[in-house]
Each structure stands twice: as C-alpha cells, then as structure tokens.
Amino acid sequence: MEGECAAYDWNDFARCLEVIDPLKQGYARASEVVNYLESHDEQRAMRDVLDSGFDEQRARPKSALGAALLFTMPGEPMLYHGQEWGEATPRLTNERNTLHWEETGDDGGKWLLNRYKQLAWLRRRHGALRGQGFSLDASYPDQTSLIYHRWDGTGDELVVAVNFSPAPQTLRVPFPSQGRWSEVFDGETLDVDIQGDYVADIAPSSARVYVKS
C-alpha cells in the first residue's frame, strides 16, 4: 500500500481498489504480502504530508488513517521506526536520520503512538485480521470512501469504514451479520438486524473499525 496507494496520496482510487486485496493480485495467501507506509528507501509519510502544506494537527490524523489500513488489511504490516509517533525527519542519504524520541511525550506524538498501540492490540487479539477472509463490501468513489469486511470463519468479524476525503462523509455501512457490533475507537455499540445497514458519519481522513461482540 506504499506509494500510489498511500493514505496521504489517494489520487487513483480505482487502482487502489484493485490492489487492496492481495488474493486478486495473484498471491496464494495474504501472508505472502508485506504492507507498509514507510521504509528507509523513501521519504517519510509525515514529511511528505507536511511538505504538501498540511500542519501537524492535520497530518497526524492522516498517519492514523494509514495505520488503520495497515493493521486491518490482508497481509503482514511492517513499521519503520518512528512512524508510530509521526517522525518527520527528512530522508538523508548516507547520513544519520535522527529520531526525535521526545515527541512521544508531546500531545500529537502521544496520541498517534496510542492509536498505533490500539491497532497492534486489535490485530493481535483478532485472528480475522491475520487470516484470509476479506471482502470489499462497498466503495463510494465520489466520496473517496470504502468499506471492507474481515472474518476468519470462527465468528470473529470486523467491518472497516474508511474515509480518505478531506471532508466528513455520511456512508451506508452494510453489516454482514446480525448481532452487536462495537466501534473500536469511541466505544459506540450497535444492535444490527440480519444484513442490516447503518448510516455512519465519518470524520475527514479517518476510519471507523467495528468488531462483532
């Protein structure tokens, strides 16, 4: 998902819909794919966002959106040291690239680090995020938004609603099964009827992750 499908540069929406599922790219198993937002070979995502004219207050939510995809998409997530708090040191070739560890204590760095911790815990707890079960259940090109479903066949299910747009969006979220669903980040709970739809308000450049209770 790095490069043209990075959360901060979601310009080719149709192309990104094609590559979001590794099984449709010819891979036999999701575990054969390594997803990443940053690596030592490219400029850091936060640096690119800041250089595009965003301030840190708007840049970190974009990084958090990328993290939500990274930990909930099929494939294995890879982190580049520092991205979990929004390190923005410019890439220097053949020189030491400084890490600003003190930023983990700043409000913005602490918030982003906690979001990464939440997502890492979520992936560790839910086998559905580490397995093969994946379906793209809705896409809204005009709103630059999509919704996908993860499952593992044991009853563990998650629904991820993603808004890549810089504006808030109201989306119809199709839940695949009835029961109680809880949103990971704000604790909202929903009682869903059989294949019930729910209308969700999603903030700009953000994701909502629902877990079946």
Regions found by a protein language model. Give the residues of each.
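Conserved alpha/beta catalytic core and glycan-binding cleft of carbohydrate-active enzymes
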Residues: 1-94, 124, 134, 140-171, ...
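A residue-level signal for conserved active-site and pocket-lining positions in enzyme catalytic cores
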Residues: 40, 119, 181, 205
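Solvent-exposed beta-hairpin/edge-strand motifs
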Residues: 174-188
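A structural signal for well-ordered alpha-helical segments within the folded catalytic domains
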Residues: 31, 61-64, 68, 110-117, ...
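C-terminal beta-strand-rich structural cap/linker in extracellular carbohydrate-active enzymes
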Residues: 193-213
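Carbohydrate-binding surfaces of carbohydrate-active enzymes
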Residues: 83, 102-107, 190, 208-210
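Aromatic- and carboxylate-lined catalytic core of secreted/periplasmic carbohydrate-active enzymes
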Residues: 16, 21, 100-139, 206
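Acyl/amide activation-and-transfer machinery of modular secondary-metabolite enzymes
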Residues: 92-102
